[in-house]
Amino acid sequence: MILYEYPFNERIRTLLRLEDLFDRLEYFLGQDHAHQHHVALTTLFEIIDVAGRADLKTDLIKELERQRQALAPLRANPQIDQEALDAVIGEIEQGIAMLNQTVGKAGQLLADNEWLTSIRSRAIIPGGTCEFDLPAYYAWQHRPAEDRRADILKWVRPLLSLRMGTTIVLRLLREAGQSGKVIATGGSYQQMLSGRSYQLMQVYLDDSLLAFIPEMSANKYMLWVRFTQQDGDLRPRSVDADIPFLLKLCNF
């Protein structure tokens, strides 16, 4: 199955972007080539930009506190697996503690490091990080991979609490969904929300339907899923076929 997700609000959109960026950073940081570590570093800049646009730390703490308060009464329910519940609550409490220990905003790392600031200002220019532009960065790229990796990990460390908080919130949200099999008749599907509020829409497609691409949109009244296909030039074109898929609507 291939999964497509659509956020209903800006807060979840920001968390999904951070999740994707942290995954990308982890992948390229695990590689050894200097070019791959360059991608890891520019991804770190993107994370700082996304996380610094709002008071993300406060939002995550509030949401985690809300989830902890919602789960705590379940400890009195004998039908609940108490060991699993304690593990979830413990993870939430650990995430809250890590976020509370984080000092300053995400962008402070960049503001306090002139060397990183110089790379960031050149990285937004196409080809702006060549050796004649940033000789010190060029020299750093020739250091052993282990040294470069240690440096990037040091710069990433202040942001790890944001990653943990983001991971917990998104996992809890995805687990709080209602799913059902539906069919996009003539390549299009719409559903009234009947006043219900959701935060995330998921569309699961069978691997055999990989050629069909869902374009999703929603407002507080209705959601739409319209399928397209790419032609030889990869331009999207409408689909007239009936396409089955699994629709999941998630909300805390």
UniProtKB/Swiss-Prot annotation:
Coiled coil: none annotated. Cell division factor that enhances FtsZ-ring assembly. Directly interacts with FtsZ and promotes bundling of FtsZ protofilaments, with a reduction in FtsZ GTPase activity. The gene is zapD. It is found in: Cytoplasm. Belongs to the ZapD family. Its main location: cytoplasm. Interacts with FtsZ. HAMAP family: ZapD. Keywords: Cell cycle, Cell division, Cytoplasm, Septation. Pfam families: ZapD. GO terms for cellular component: cell division site; cytoplasm. One of its GO terms (biological process) is FtsZ-dependent cytokinesis. InterPro entries: ZapD, ZapD_C, ZapD_sf. PANTHER family: CELL DIVISION PROTEIN ZAPD. This is Cell division protein ZapD. It comes from the Bacteria.
